[in-house]
Structures are given as C-alpha cells and as structure tokens.
Amino acid sequence: MEMASAFTLNVRLDNIAIITIDVPGEKMNTLKAEFASQVRAIIKQLRENKELRGVVFVSAKPDNFIAGADINMIGNCKTAQEAEVLARQGQQLMAEIHALPIPVIAAIHGACLGGGLELALACHGRVCTDDPKTVLGLPEVQLGLLPGSGGTQRLPRLIGVSTALEMILTGKQLRAKQAVKLGLVDDVVPHSILLEAAVELAKQDRPSSRPLPVRERILAGPLGRALLFKMVGKKTEHKTQGNYPATERILEVVETGLAQGTSSGYDAEARAFGELAMTPQSQALRNIFFASTEVKKDPGSDAPPAPLNSVGILGGGLMGGGIAYVTACKAGLPVRIKDINPQGINHALKYSWDQLEGKVRRRHLKASERDKQLALISGTTDYCGFAHRDLIIEAVFENLELKQQMVAEVEQNCATHTIFASNTSSLPIGDIAAHAARPEQVIGLHFFSPVEKMPLVEIIPHASTSAQTIATTVKLAKKQGKTPIVVRDKAGFYVNRILAPYINEAIRMLTEGERIEHIDTALVKFGFPVGPIQLLDEVGIDTGTKIMPVLEAAYGERFSAPANVVSSILNDDRKGRKNGRGFYLYGQKGRKSKKQVDPAIYPLIGAQGQGRLSAPQVAERCVMLMLNEAVCCLDEQVIRSVRDGDIGAVFGIGFPPFLGGPFRYIDSLGAGEVVAIMQRLATQYGSRFTPCNRFVEMSERGESFWKTTATDLQ
C-alpha cells in the first residue's frame, strides 16, 4: 500500500498553487529524505502549468509549519560521506524550489525550525502569524550539527552576517515581531488571514530583498568580515571551551560562502555537515534529544491519571512563587497560594508579575494575555478555596514536623481525592507520609531553582504511593513544561545525591590548597555551565550544605564533607550570592558588577591557595565521584533506567550535554578504564573513590550501560 503524500498540490481558481504540508500520522511535520520525490513531482507540475501566477507552501498541522528534518535520517548514516550526500540532496531540493520562475511564498504558523526554516528561506517570500506558537530558528547546533540544506548561506544574505551568526551559533528562536524586524519574514498577520496574505504576496512580483543595514553591509566586506569573525570566534571559544566542534565549523562555512561565493559555501556546508554528524559530540547530543523525547512520553505508571482542574500551593516563598508561575502560566491551571502571612502571598504574586511583565516589555506577550494569566493566581492565609483542589504542592521549610502537619491540614481541609506533593529536596517522602490518613496520595515533587528555568523535576513515590498518584503528578509536571523522572525514595533522591560528592571533593581540594578559580575553571573547561564552588554560592551555601549530614548519615563516610570549612564559612555569615558574600564577593546589582574570589576565604578555612593539580586532575576527582554515585543509584534502583540517569544529570545539574550524561560518558571511556582511574584515585586520596560493586562487575564482564536498540545511537 502506497504511503499518503506529505505534500499535496491544489491550484486555486486565481491560478495560485497551494502546496499543503501534512506528514501522515504525525503531530509534527518533519522532513524526510523520501519526501524529495514528492516535492519534485509537484515542481514538475508547477513548471508545466504556464498559467500559474505563484505558489504558497502552508502546513495543515494546527501548531507547526515544519519542526525540522527527521533526525533519524542522520542516525542511519554510517559514514561522513553518507551524511554529506544527505545534505547535498537537501541543498539541491531547496535550489529547485528557489529556481521556480514564479513567486514562491511560505505561509508560516507555529514552529518553523531547522530544515523547515531552510525550506522557507528557499522561498522568495515569507509571511507568518502573530501567534505565540510561531517561532523561527536553526537549532542544529544544539545537536552538534550545522544547517545542511543551505541555511548557512541563505540566512546571512537575507538578514546580515552578524545577526545570522547569532541565530546559527546559538540556535536562538525568533518570534514573529523579531523576525519581521530583521527581515526574515516579509509580513506578520493574524492566523485567520495567513493563507490569503501569502496568496496576495504570491500574486505580486518576487519580493525584492530589502537592503541590509549599513552595519551589516560593512561587516560583510573583507575588513569588517575579518574583524567580525575574529571577535565572534573568540567569544564562541570562551563560551564553548572548545567542547562543541559545530560552532567552529559554522564560522568556517559561513565565512567561506561570503569570501568565495555561494557555490563554495554550499560545498563547505555539506562537507562540514557530514563530518559533524560522525562526531561523538553530535551523537551524544542526539542521544540526549531522543532520551528527553522518550521521557516526555513516559506516563510514569500504567494507571490512568486523575483529572487535574486546579492546584493549591503551600508557601509563597521563592519556590512557591516559581511553582505558582509555571502552574498558571505554563500549565494554564488555576492556582491558590496559602501562606501564613499576606506578605508571602504578595511575594508569590509579584514573582509571576515580574516574569510576565518582562515578556510584555520584550514584546513576547500582550498585556491582555499577561492579565489573563495573572487572574489564574489567587492567595489566602487559610484554607479558603482549597476544598476542591485536585493536587496540593507543599513548598514550606525543610522541617519534617512542619511537613507532616501540612499533610494533616490538607487531609482535613481538602477533598478525599486530593494529592499531596512535597517539594522537599532531602526529607524522605515515607517519613512525611508517616501519619497520613491517605498515604497513597502523598508523593514527592522536587523542583529545582529557579523553577521557571530548570527543566527537570524529580517525582518521588514512597512505598505506599498509588500508581494513579504517580501518573497524575507526572501529568502535572509535563503540563508545567517540565521533564519528569520518577526516582526512589532514598536520601538525596538522584540529582542531589550525585551532586553532593562532586561538590564535597571541590571543597576538599580547596582545603588542600587549590585556588577557588582554578577549581571552577577546571570544571567549566570540562563542560559544566558553572564550577562547583560557584554553584554552591548560587544555590546558597546554607541551603546547599544542609543536605550533607543527611547523606552522610544514610551512606557513610564517602559523603563526609570537610566540616570545619562549612562551619567556618557559615559562621562568618557567608551565604553566597544572596547576601553578597560567599566564596566569591558580589558587587551591587547592576550590569557592571562582577563577582570576584574573596581572598579572605583562604585564611578563614586554613588553606594556602597554592595548588599543585592540573585542571584535568581537578576535574577528574570531582567527576569520577559523580559517575560512581550515578552507578550506585542505578544499582539501588533509585533511578529506573540509564536513560533517566543521563537526563537527570544533564537537565538537573548541567552535566556536559556533549558527553551524553554520566552513563553515556562511562560507556565512551569504557567501564574498565573508569574503574582503573577510580582505583588509582582511591590509592592516592582515600576509600571514597572505591568503585561500587556494580561498576567492578561490569568492568570485568566488559559490559556497557546502554544496550543497542532501534532508537539508540551508538
């Protein structure tokens, strides 16, 4: 049976051809290699019909134009040459669209990304909707690739080289108003008239490319170009620390096209695409993409979730305010906040106001939409309005008795079906539910700060939590825009448990004489977004170290931190960024204020600050402990799979994405190599580096954590 076509042609009475994109059986339109013959058949018909005045590409999907190319095509390539051929085929198809003698217009609604934007760039004009769902971008760099169907050549010529480089190097997505301002699209219209607006544009002569701003014209010239690429290259190297080869190749390919012409540019683009597709960095980043997609589809349990119509939140502090924001503004659910005083409620409301007002100022949101979203949030100092809430999220202080009291109050004041979800970061959920009348409806829901930015949540059922409670909580997390992993109710759960030994080792090296900036720089060079010492400052030293005694009590000496260091710092009223002094000093709020290491730290903790370790040695000590703890968590079934372990580390603490997560990284090194490194470190520095039994057994058997499956790139 022949598969239905993803591209269909209809010719209107006014001789405008409408090409409708609708990939059968898929929510999102993605481009596949087999579609090329369909498009070419349509192009042939267009060329044969001499009556046609213009062509419009439009999507039949409700919320996307084309979300990109099907990434599985790249995974199916075994060599750089095969991937290069894939790119050249894409370039050729786009060239054939562009070569049509009549105006070709893209009518864009929803996501227009990657190969979708490259198709739109091959058209002679573009019209998009003013809908918030409409975004345009080239995110290939986030998969360790570059745009391979002409995007590196067409975009700089359309909007200017400096603006194009920013888009391609960062994967930045533009909203409609930004796109029209930059000249990426010709017009922005309401969704209701998108097709007619595109048709009207198609009836005119080909839209002439508008002149670039003077600055962009200067930067495209030989002198300006040399200066621009030198500056951007330096900035990019600092940002990526040389860990992402795609950025270097993007600069090279764009510059080639500008200096030597589009023919050379397209050739360089295809070759670079093929080579990048075979890099371990791209394979790791694509694996993370596939894993996160799978996690987002995972319901958490086999039971059907309960209905979710409204949510309550206990506590209007930083976490409570953030949770209220994502619940109302991302999930679209009514939220009722309870706090013991009105100031707490005001704080939570202001949190959402600040987030939404920022969007209004950046013109990402209309004022009317801001007001509509804010209207979903209300507050109270008692349980008024809580009687019929489907799920309550508790975000009060880390105190077991207080949280147990919250459970009792919710059971007394809410419906019998209400779920109680605790945002605890360290207390066992089983203990919180110990005196509950309905323990099957108590669960952990651990958000990370800042709530609106951190993509991960940990969902923690205790022994008596029902399958439906798990499924309902997972459902809420997804509606909030989060990536949820279900973890076992053991001290530290997963993310904090693998993070603690990593930070402890950094503090221990500090006491041994390593300098703060050397430790942090070493881990940033390794690939983390910030170093462990700075991370502790950002989280809050008082908050970040609170969990350490809990973990040491649960797991023993390998979690012991240099107690004198922590106590000395806290006794000196150093809490980190939040009070302006921690390991670093922070200037007054403002654009020019920069953090700097406080030299007073060294005498305070009795350290010399004259280190002997190289950056790789520093990174090795911190990272090996994290890897070992991740394997311990898998062995103890704290995480359900290596997939969840990799996603939890990358999304929860910024484990370098280009390494694919702890388990992918172990597989790339080989379990035997990692065990040998840890045994050497154990001899040098102590028993905390002793590899866990599962690690040793896998090493002896030559096994890897990730097994080859249909969806797994090896």
UniProtKB/Swiss-Prot annotation:
Entry's EC annotation: 4.2.1.17, 5.1.2.3, 1.1.1.35
The entry lists its GO molecular-function terms as: 3-hydroxybutyryl-CoA epimerase activity; enoyl-CoA hydratase activity; long-chain-3-hydroxyacyl-CoA dehydrogenase activity; NAD+ binding
Q: Which Pfam families match?
A: 3HCDH, 3HCDH_N, ECH_1
Protein location: Cytoplasm
- Pathway membership: Lipid metabolism; fatty acid beta-oxidation
Q: What SUPFAM superfamilies does the entry give?
A: 6-phosphogluconate dehydrogenase C-terminal domain-like (SSF48179), ClpP/crotonase (SSF52096), NAD(P)-binding Rossmann-fold domains (SSF51735)
- What keywords is this UniProt entry annotated with? Cytoplasm, Fatty acid metabolism, Isomerase, Lipid degradation, Lipid metabolism, Lyase, Multifunctional enzyme, NAD, Oxidoreductase
Recorded GO cellular component terms are: cytoplasm
Q: Catalytic activity, per the record?
A: a (3S)-3-hydroxyacyl-CoA = a (2E)-enoyl-CoA + H2O; a 4-saturated-(3S)-3-hydroxyacyl-CoA = a (3E)-enoyl-CoA + H2O; a (3S)-3-hydroxyacyl-CoA + NAD(+) = a 3-oxoacyl-CoA + NADH + H(+); (3S)-3-hydroxybutanoyl-CoA = (3R)-3-hydroxybutanoyl-CoA
What's one GO BP annotation on this UniProt entry?
fatty acid beta-oxidation
**Region annotation 3-hydroxyacyl-CoA dehydrogenase: residue ranges?**
306-714
Site: Important for catalytic activity. Where?
Answer: 118, 140
According to the record, the residues making up region (Enoyl-CoA hydratase) are 1-190
Main localization of the protein? cytoplasm
User: What is its biological role?
Assistant: Catalyzes the formation of a hydroxyacyl-CoA by addition of water on enoyl-CoA. Also exhibits 3-hydroxyacyl-CoA epimerase and 3-hydroxyacyl-CoA dehydrogenase activities.
Q: Quaternary arrangement and interactors, per the entry? A: Heterotetramer of two alpha chains (FadJ) and two beta chains (FadI).
Q: What NCBIfam families does the entry give?
A: FadJ, PRK11154.1
* Stated family: In the N-terminal section; belongs to the enoyl-CoA hydratase/isomerase family. In the central section; belongs to the 3-hydroxyacyl-CoA dehydrogenase family.
Name this protein carries in UniProt: Fatty acid oxidation complex subunit alpha
Q: Which organism is it from?
A: Escherichia coli O6:K15:H31 (strain 536 / UPEC)
The gene coding this protein: fadJ
